[in-house]
């Protein structure tokens, strides 16, 4: 037996070599440059073994094959040439594995992503387990990169160019049965027989190249290929607006390999990898990755969290149903819902059932797994079953007296250790806790809608919240699959506070005569997932604007809504998508049509569209209001660090990820340039654009929000 730091070679009695991957001291297997020499030594040993019957690559980790390459390697590269050399080295190692004279099989259980899938693609065959943890994909585009160890060349030849482009451009991850159907794996087996199945396959003759489906063969021809690449390029630009350079480079590199041969393709792949690694977009996206990874390790306070055994939810509406769903399906904790009516209970239970049933229909979940997860959710119209709940999450109407009554009832019907977490979006947590007998166990836990999709939660302690309560609440959020940031107990907290001036400015542009389409398109081109006016329609115009008066009372006229536009819209019973009446037209259920603005809106607000601003000017006004408010929030300690502020904006409101978040973007622009731009806008449009004190101080001293030269955010002081 030969042993290395991460790769171990062992010969079986049947002369099948098993290469076990197990990076010491790490939960996840990741590929590092320093492993290259060890892997090459193993490959050399295998090549020289004349009795070798086959080779199996398998992981010793319980839930991952290889999660990808270590991204820190890129951070250490000082030039595109260094990053290109890194990719070339990876390509060469994969080529050496591929060139082994026997059948090489990848035995995959758990995450097989990025460089992990590229290693599996270098093998002649792949077998994976049928476990829910098993996922296969090339997610490098999400870091502003492309697969650099042969993935752009091997995947199209294995599954077809159309399927490969879909996977690589979207960073799409396939489940076992999807991978089998696509031809990415050759078999799906239970984990208990994975090694034996792979070893038996390895002893067989190497397979002939897979025959692609008819559609993929047609697209591989000159005419089909030209049409495909034209359509993919057009669709990609419509989606990215040129903000993500990796997308176009992926298309170009895949095409190069298909039209000029794999040698040219590999060369183009390595070169593109090196150049993309040096782009500001990749640096920003990798910065976000490191920031979220770092945040996952934190407990939110210096105290240790209490163990969680069960959870309660008050309210069976959209939010309550969503909170119960993620508690049962992600945290795998028993959850009890209380609502005042049977209708509310039925709604909450149906919410979870419908989502789980959809997963079953799509073969993402077995019916037995659906039933097991639904069994974790129970409900009643009284407090039976609440006595030993560790946390009760309140999701009732935004009414202070009602929420205070909920605190009193929970304290009366639960254990002394039970935490009361309010899902308020606007009410001060200190006010909710004002009459509590255990105020140290009252905290805010602000989810975003829809709960099953939005990754962020804000954890809001008031002045009297205990450190243990904070840590335990953060722990629950993580178990629910959320990214929690701890924010201060003040009006709007963080996310809604920076979102409000952004939406207000969009409404001001509307009142000045700019069309709804032009405003939304300007911000989508800037990189937001939807425009600010469409966002109002999506979240509900009544809900989205309810917080505006609260913010204006707390922070003054810079939060005042423009004119009576919102009142006129609401008075016409326009609440957005949820009631089919908003700024946009919504077709009857079941009918699809292109998104269109409702022209009647202009008459309601007394505006004739015909503004003179460019899209860039509209985007600048809206984004600058958000950035200025974000800087204020950091200065006031609303967020603990620039890191938390960036994560909150990207995951909470869809701030363009390629910019890295508002604080990294302000660093890119520079504090002095920010102050100059805001002063110019203040001169033209009013005092609401006046640069905040923090930016003015930083402009004088040359400070940045993120410490220069690394990915660490400056903490507030």
UniProtKB/Swiss-Prot annotation:
Q: What reaction does this catalyse?
A: a (3S)-3-hydroxyacyl-CoA = a (2E)-enoyl-CoA + H2O; a 4-saturated-(3S)-3-hydroxyacyl-CoA = a (3E)-enoyl-CoA + H2O; a (3S)-3-hydroxyacyl-CoA + NAD(+) = a 3-oxoacyl-CoA + NADH + H(+); (3S)-3-hydroxybutanoyl-CoA = (3R)-3-hydroxybutanoyl-CoA
Which InterPro entries does the protein's record reference? 3-OHacyl-CoA_DH_CS, 3-OHacyl-CoA_DH_NAD-bd, 3HC_DH_C, 6-PGluconate_DH-like_C_sf, ClpP/crotonase-like_dom_sf, Enoyl-CoA_hydra/iso, FA_oxidation_alpha_subunit, FadJ
> Can you quote a single GO CC term?
cytoplasm
EC numbers for this chain:
4.2.1.17, 5.1.2.3, 1.1.1.35
In chain numbering, the residues marked as site (Important for catalytic activity) are 118, 140
Residue ranges for the region (3-hydroxyacyl-CoA dehydrogenase) are 306-717
Alphabetized PROSITE patterns for the sequence: 3HCDH
* Annotated stretches, region: Enoyl-CoA hydratase: 1-190
Q: Which UniProt keywords apply?
A: Cytoplasm, Fatty acid metabolism, Isomerase, Lipid degradation, Lipid metabolism, Lyase, Multifunctional enzyme, NAD, Oxidoreductase
One GO MF term on file is: NAD+ binding
User: A GO biological process this protein is involved in?
Assistant: fatty acid beta-oxidation
Q: Where in the cell is it found?
A: Cytoplasm
The pathway entry for this protein reads as: Lipid metabolism; fatty acid beta-oxidation
Family assignment from sequence similarity: In the N-terminal section; belongs to the enoyl-CoA hydratase/isomerase family. In the central section; belongs to the 3-hydroxyacyl-CoA dehydrogenase family.
Q: Describe the protein's quaternary organization and the partners it interacts with.
A: Heterotetramer of two alpha chains (FadJ) and two beta chains (FadI).
Listed HAMAP family: FadJ (MF_01617)
Summarizing the function annotation, the protein's role is: Catalyzes the formation of a hydroxyacyl-CoA by addition of water on enoyl-CoA. Also exhibits 3-hydroxyacyl-CoA epimerase and 3-hydroxyacyl-CoA dehydrogenase activities.
Name of the protein this chain belongs to: Fatty acid oxidation complex subunit alpha
| Species in which this protein is naturally found | Cronobacter sakazakii (strain ATCC BAA-894)
Q: Source organism lineage?
A: Bacteria, Pseudomonadati, Pseudomonadota, Gammaproteobacteria, Enterobacterales
């Amino acid at each position: 037996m030969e042993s290395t730091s991460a790769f171990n070679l062992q010969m079986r009695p049947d002369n099948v070599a098993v290469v076990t991957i197990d990076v010491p001291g790490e939960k996840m297997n990741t590929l590092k440059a320093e492993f290259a020499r060890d892997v090459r030594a193993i490959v050399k040993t295998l090549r020289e073994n004349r009795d070798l019957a086959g080779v199996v690559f398998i992981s010793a980790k319980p839930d991952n094959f290889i999660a990808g390459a270590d991204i820190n390697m890129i951070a250490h590269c000082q030039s595109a040439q260094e990053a290109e050399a890194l990719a070339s080295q990876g390509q060469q190692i994969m080529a050496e594995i591929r060139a082994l004279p026997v059948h090489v099989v990848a035995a995959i259980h758990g995450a097989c992503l990025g460089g992990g899938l590229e290693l599996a693609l270098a093998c002649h065959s792949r077998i994976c387990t049928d476990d829910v943890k098993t996922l296969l994909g090339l997610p490098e585009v999400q870091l502003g990169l492309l697969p650099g160890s042969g993935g752009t060349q091997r995947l199209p030849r294995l599954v077809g160019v159309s399927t490969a482009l879909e996977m690589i451009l979207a960073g799409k991850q396939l489940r076992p049965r999807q991978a089998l159907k696509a031809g990415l794996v050759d078999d799906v087996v239970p984990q208990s027989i994975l090694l034996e199945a792979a070893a038996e396959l390895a002893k067989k003759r190497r397979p002939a190249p897979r025959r692609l489906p008819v559609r993929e063969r047609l697209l591989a021809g000159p005419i089909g290929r030209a049409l495909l690449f034209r359509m993919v390029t057009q669709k990609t630009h419509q989606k990215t607006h040129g903000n993500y350079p990796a997308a176009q480079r992926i298309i170009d590199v895949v095409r190069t390999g298909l039209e000029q041969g794999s040698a040219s393709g590999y060369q183009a792949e390595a070169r593109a990898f090196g150049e993309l690694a040096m782009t500001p977009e990749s640096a920003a996206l990798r910065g976000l990755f490191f920031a979220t990874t770092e945040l996952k390790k934190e407990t939110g306070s210096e105290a240790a969290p209490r163990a969680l055994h069960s959870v309660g939810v008050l309210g069976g509406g959209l939010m309550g149903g969503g909170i119960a769903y993620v508690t049962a399906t992600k945290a795998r904790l028993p959850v009890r819902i209380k609502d005042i009516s049977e209708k509310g209970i039925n709604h909450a239970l149906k919410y979870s059932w419908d989502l789980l049933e959809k997963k079953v229909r799509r073969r993402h979940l077995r019916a037995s797994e659906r039933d097991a997860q639904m069994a974790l959710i129970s409900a009643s119209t009284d407090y039976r079953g609440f006595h030993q709940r560790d946390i009760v999450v309140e999701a009732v109407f935004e009414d202070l007296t009602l929420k205070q009554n909920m605190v009193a009832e929970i304290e009366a019907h639960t254990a002394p250790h039970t935490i009361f977490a309010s899902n308020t979006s606007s009410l001060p947590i200190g006010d909710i806790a004002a009459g509590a007998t255990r105020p140290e166990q009252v905290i805010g836990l602000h989810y975003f809608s829809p709960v099953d999709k939005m990754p962020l939660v804000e954890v809001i302690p008031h002045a009297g919240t205990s450190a243990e309560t904070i840590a335990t609440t953060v722990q629950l959020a993580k178990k629910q699959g959320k990214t929690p940031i701890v924010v201060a107990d003040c009006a709007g907290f963080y996310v809604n506070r920076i979102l409000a001036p952004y939406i207000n400015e969009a409404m001001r542009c509307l009142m000045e005569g700019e069309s709804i389409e032009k405003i939304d398109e300007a911000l989508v081109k800037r990189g937001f997932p939807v425009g600010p006016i469409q966002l109002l329609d999506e979240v509900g115009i009544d809900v989205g604007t309810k917080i505006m008066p609260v913010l204006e009372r707390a922070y003054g006229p810079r939060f005042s809504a423009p004119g009576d536009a919102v009142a006129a819209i609401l008075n016409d019973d326009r609440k957005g998508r949820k009631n089919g009446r908003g700024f946009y037209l919504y077709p009857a259920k079941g009918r699809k049509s292109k998104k269109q603005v409702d022209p009647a809106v202009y008459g309601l607000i007394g505006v004739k569209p015909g503004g003179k601003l460019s899209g860039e000017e509209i985007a600048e006004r809206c984004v600058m209001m958000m950035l200025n408010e974000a800087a204020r929030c950091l200065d006031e300690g609303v967020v603990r660090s620039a890191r938390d502020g960036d994560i909150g904006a990207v995951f909470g409101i869809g701030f363009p990820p390629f910019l890295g978040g508002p604080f990294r973007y302000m660093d890119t622009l520079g504090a002095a340039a920010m102050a100059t731009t805001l002063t110019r806008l203040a001169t033209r449009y009013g005092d609401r654009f006046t640069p905040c004190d923090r930016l003015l101080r930083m402009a004088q001293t040359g400070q940045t929000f993120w410490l220069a030269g690394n990915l660490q955010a400056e903490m507030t002081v």
